[in-house]
Amino acid sequence: MNRASLEKNPHEVASMFDGVARRYDLTNTVLSLGQDRFWRRATREALQLSPADKVLDLAAGTAVSTVELASSGAWCVAADFSVGMLAAGASRRVPKVAGDATRLPFDDGVFDAVTISFGLRNVVDFSAGLREMARVTRPGGRLVVCEFSTPTNGLFSTVYKEYLMKALPAMATAVSSNPDAYVYLAESIRAWPDQRALARRIEAAGWSDVRWRNLTGGIVALHAATKP
Protein backbone atom coordinates (compact mmCIF):
# COMPACT_ATOMS: atom_id res chain seq x y z
CA MET A 1 0.00 0.00 0.00
CA ASN A 2 1.67 3.23 -1.15
CA ARG A 3 -1.13 5.69 -0.57
CA ALA A 4 -3.87 5.75 2.06
CA SER A 5 -7.37 6.56 0.90
CA LEU A 6 -9.39 9.32 2.54
CA GLU A 7 -11.35 6.56 4.32
CA LYS A 8 -8.24 6.38 6.55
CA ASN A 9 -7.89 2.69 7.27
CA PRO A 10 -5.65 2.90 10.37
CA HIS A 11 -3.27 0.14 9.29
CA GLU A 12 -2.86 1.63 5.83
CA VAL A 13 -2.22 5.13 7.18
CA ALA A 14 0.33 3.77 9.68
CA SER A 15 2.04 1.83 6.89
CA MET A 16 2.13 4.94 4.72
CA PHE A 17 3.87 6.92 7.46
CA ASP A 18 6.27 4.06 8.14
CA GLY A 19 7.24 4.36 4.48
CA VAL A 20 8.08 8.07 4.63
CA ALA A 21 9.67 8.08 8.09
CA ARG A 22 13.33 8.14 7.04
CA ARG A 23 13.14 11.49 5.21
CA TYR A 24 9.99 12.85 6.86
CA ASP A 25 11.53 15.81 8.69
CA LEU A 26 13.57 16.98 5.70
CA THR A 27 10.56 16.64 3.39
CA ASN A 28 8.35 18.67 5.72
CA THR A 29 10.88 21.49 5.93
CA VAL A 30 11.26 21.61 2.14
CA LEU A 31 7.53 21.42 1.36
CA SER A 32 6.60 24.01 4.02
CA LEU A 33 9.39 26.33 2.84
CA GLY A 34 10.78 26.25 6.37
CA GLN A 35 7.51 27.26 8.06
CA ASP A 36 7.36 23.98 10.02
CA ARG A 37 9.81 25.37 12.58
CA PHE A 38 7.64 28.46 13.13
CA TRP A 39 4.50 26.30 13.50
CA ARG A 40 6.17 24.10 16.13
CA ARG A 41 7.29 27.13 18.12
CA ALA A 42 3.82 28.70 17.92
CA THR A 43 2.28 25.46 19.21
CA ARG A 44 4.60 25.40 22.20
CA GLU A 45 3.88 29.03 23.01
CA ALA A 46 0.10 28.49 22.74
CA LEU A 47 0.26 25.73 25.36
CA GLN A 48 1.83 28.11 27.93
CA LEU A 49 3.83 25.29 29.49
CA SER A 50 5.62 25.31 32.83
CA PRO A 51 8.30 22.91 34.12
CA ALA A 52 5.71 21.23 36.36
CA ASP A 53 3.48 20.23 33.43
CA LYS A 54 3.03 16.75 32.01
CA VAL A 55 2.37 16.94 28.27
CA LEU A 56 1.15 14.44 25.69
CA ASP A 57 2.36 15.11 22.15
CA LEU A 58 0.03 13.00 20.03
CA ALA A 59 0.80 12.00 16.43
CA ALA A 60 4.33 13.09 17.31
CA GLY A 61 5.98 11.20 14.47
CA THR A 62 9.76 11.44 14.81
CA ALA A 63 9.35 13.47 18.03
CA VAL A 64 10.81 16.67 16.59
CA SER A 65 7.69 18.45 17.90
CA THR A 66 8.12 16.81 21.32
CA VAL A 67 11.66 18.13 21.61
CA GLU A 68 10.33 21.64 20.89
CA LEU A 69 7.70 21.24 23.63
CA ALA A 70 10.27 19.87 26.08
CA SER A 71 12.42 22.98 25.60
CA SER A 72 9.91 24.66 27.94
CA GLY A 73 11.13 22.44 30.78
CA ALA A 74 7.87 20.44 30.87
CA TRP A 75 7.87 16.62 30.92
CA CYS A 76 6.69 15.53 27.47
CA VAL A 77 5.91 12.14 25.95
CA ALA A 78 5.64 11.44 22.22
CA ALA A 79 2.87 9.10 21.07
CA ASP A 80 2.25 7.87 17.53
CA PHE A 81 0.65 4.87 15.85
CA SER A 82 3.49 4.60 13.30
CA VAL A 83 6.27 2.55 14.85
CA GLY A 84 8.46 3.46 11.90
CA MET A 85 8.11 7.16 12.65
CA LEU A 86 8.98 6.68 16.32
CA ALA A 87 11.99 4.57 15.32
CA ALA A 88 13.18 7.31 12.95
CA GLY A 89 13.24 9.65 15.95
CA ALA A 90 15.08 7.22 18.22
CA SER A 91 17.97 9.64 18.75
CA ARG A 92 15.65 12.26 20.25
CA ARG A 93 15.83 11.85 24.00
CA VAL A 94 12.18 12.06 24.97
CA PRO A 95 9.85 9.25 26.13
CA LYS A 96 8.00 7.55 23.25
CA VAL A 97 4.87 5.38 23.22
CA ALA A 98 3.17 3.60 20.33
CA GLY A 99 -0.57 4.17 20.53
CA ASP A 100 -3.83 4.83 18.69
CA ALA A 101 -5.40 8.26 19.25
CA THR A 102 -8.82 6.66 19.74
CA ARG A 103 -7.54 4.21 22.40
CA LEU A 104 -4.76 5.95 24.28
CA PRO A 105 -2.70 3.80 26.69
CA PHE A 106 -2.96 6.29 29.56
CA ASP A 107 -5.13 6.66 32.67
CA ASP A 108 -7.79 9.34 33.04
CA GLY A 109 -6.68 12.89 33.80
CA VAL A 110 -2.92 12.31 33.84
CA PHE A 111 -1.83 15.18 31.56
CA ASP A 112 -1.83 18.93 32.11
CA ALA A 113 -1.79 19.54 28.37
CA VAL A 114 -2.34 17.57 25.17
CA THR A 115 -1.39 18.61 21.67
CA ILE A 116 -1.63 17.11 18.20
CA SER A 117 0.10 18.64 15.18
CA PHE A 118 -0.86 17.73 11.62
CA GLY A 119 -2.25 14.41 12.83
CA LEU A 120 -5.93 14.93 13.57
CA ARG A 121 -6.75 14.61 9.83
CA ASN A 122 -5.29 11.09 9.90
CA VAL A 123 -7.38 9.77 12.81
CA VAL A 124 -10.08 7.41 11.53
CA ASP A 125 -12.68 9.02 13.85
CA PHE A 126 -11.21 12.34 14.88
CA SER A 127 -14.16 13.23 17.14
CA ALA A 128 -13.46 10.04 19.10
CA GLY A 129 -9.82 11.07 19.21
CA LEU A 130 -10.73 14.47 20.64
CA ARG A 131 -12.87 12.79 23.31
CA GLU A 132 -10.00 10.47 24.17
CA MET A 133 -7.65 13.44 24.50
CA ALA A 134 -10.15 15.00 26.92
CA ARG A 135 -10.26 11.76 28.91
CA VAL A 136 -6.51 11.75 29.60
CA THR A 137 -6.39 15.49 30.42
CA ARG A 138 -7.03 16.79 33.94
CA PRO A 139 -9.86 19.29 34.56
CA GLY A 140 -8.55 22.72 33.65
CA GLY A 141 -5.94 21.20 31.35
CA ARG A 142 -5.23 22.53 27.86
CA LEU A 143 -5.56 21.29 24.31
CA VAL A 144 -3.83 22.76 21.25
CA VAL A 145 -4.51 21.37 17.79
CA CYS A 146 -2.11 22.53 15.08
CA GLU A 147 -3.54 21.57 11.70
CA PHE A 148 -3.71 22.63 8.09
CA SER A 149 -6.74 24.84 7.52
CA THR A 150 -8.38 27.30 5.13
CA PRO A 151 -6.56 30.46 3.96
CA THR A 152 -8.54 33.59 4.77
CA ASN A 153 -7.68 35.58 1.63
CA GLY A 154 -9.51 34.50 -1.54
CA LEU A 155 -6.64 35.10 -3.96
CA PHE A 156 -4.12 33.50 -1.61
CA SER A 157 -6.48 30.53 -1.19
CA THR A 158 -6.57 30.01 -4.96
CA VAL A 159 -2.77 30.10 -5.21
CA TYR A 160 -2.46 27.73 -2.25
CA LYS A 161 -4.84 25.19 -3.79
CA GLU A 162 -2.76 25.24 -6.98
CA TYR A 163 0.34 24.61 -4.87
CA LEU A 164 -1.31 21.71 -3.05
CA MET A 165 -2.51 19.90 -6.14
CA LYS A 166 0.35 20.65 -8.56
CA ALA A 167 3.57 21.98 -7.06
CA LEU A 168 3.55 19.98 -3.82
CA PRO A 169 3.32 16.52 -5.49
CA ALA A 170 6.11 17.49 -7.90
CA MET A 171 8.36 18.67 -5.06
CA ALA A 172 7.55 15.55 -3.04
CA THR A 173 8.69 13.39 -5.94
CA ALA A 174 12.12 15.02 -5.67
CA VAL A 175 12.62 14.77 -1.90
CA SER A 176 10.31 12.08 -0.45
CA SER A 177 10.74 8.32 -0.34
CA ASN A 178 6.99 7.94 -1.02
CA PRO A 179 5.57 10.82 -3.11
CA ASP A 180 2.08 9.24 -3.14
CA ALA A 181 1.83 9.97 0.59
CA TYR A 182 1.96 13.67 -0.22
CA VAL A 183 -0.83 13.35 -2.77
CA TYR A 184 -2.89 11.95 0.13
CA LEU A 185 -1.71 14.91 2.22
CA ALA A 186 -2.99 17.40 -0.35
CA GLU A 187 -6.32 15.63 -0.76
CA SER A 188 -6.88 15.29 2.98
CA ILE A 189 -6.18 19.00 3.49
CA ARG A 190 -8.77 19.93 0.87
CA ALA A 191 -11.35 17.68 2.56
CA TRP A 192 -10.68 19.03 6.08
CA PRO A 193 -13.16 21.31 7.95
CA ASP A 194 -12.42 25.02 8.06
CA GLN A 195 -11.53 26.86 11.26
CA ARG A 196 -15.07 27.47 12.49
CA ALA A 197 -16.29 23.97 11.69
CA LEU A 198 -13.35 22.36 13.48
CA ALA A 199 -13.95 24.58 16.52
CA ARG A 200 -17.52 23.25 16.69
CA ARG A 201 -16.26 19.66 16.52
CA ILE A 202 -13.76 20.27 19.32
CA GLU A 203 -16.49 21.77 21.51
CA ALA A 204 -18.84 18.87 20.73
CA ALA A 205 -16.13 16.46 21.91
CA GLY A 206 -16.28 17.92 25.42
CA TRP A 207 -13.81 20.80 25.36
CA SER A 208 -14.67 24.37 26.41
CA ASP A 209 -13.41 27.89 25.65
CA VAL A 210 -12.51 26.89 22.09
CA ARG A 211 -10.74 29.53 20.03
CA TRP A 212 -8.33 29.63 17.12
CA ARG A 213 -5.47 31.65 15.69
CA ASN A 214 -4.46 31.58 12.03
CA LEU A 215 -0.82 31.09 11.05
CA THR A 216 0.72 31.78 7.64
CA GLY A 217 -2.46 33.36 6.31
CA GLY A 218 -4.68 30.49 7.46
CA ILE A 219 -2.67 27.71 5.82
CA VAL A 220 -2.39 26.47 9.39
CA ALA A 221 -4.64 27.16 12.37
CA LEU A 222 -3.97 26.68 16.07
CA HIS A 223 -7.14 25.66 17.92
CA ALA A 224 -6.90 25.95 21.70
CA ALA A 225 -9.39 24.67 24.29
CA THR A 226 -9.75 23.83 27.97
CA LYS A 227 -10.93 20.66 29.72
CA PRO A 228 -13.98 21.62 31.85
Curated annotation (Swiss-Prot):
CDD domains: AdoMet_MTases
Alphabetical GO biological process terms: menaquinone biosynthetic process; methylation
Catalysed reaction, written as an equation: a 2-demethylmenaquinol + S-adenosyl-L-methionine = a menaquinol + S-adenosyl-L-homocysteine + H(+)
UniProt keyword annotations, A-Z: Menaquinone biosynthesis, Methyltransferase, S-adenosyl-L-methionine, Transferase
Entry EC number(s): 2.1.1.163
Class of this enzyme: transferase
Binding site for S-adenosyl-L-methionine: 62, 80, 100-101, 117
PANTHER family listed in its UniProt record: 2-METHOXY-6-POLYPRENYL-1,4-BENZOQUINOL METHYLASE, MITOCHONDRIAL, METHYLTRANSFERASE
Name assigned to this protein: Demethylmenaquinone methyltransferase
Source organism of this protein record: Mycolicibacterium gilvum (strain PYR-GCK)
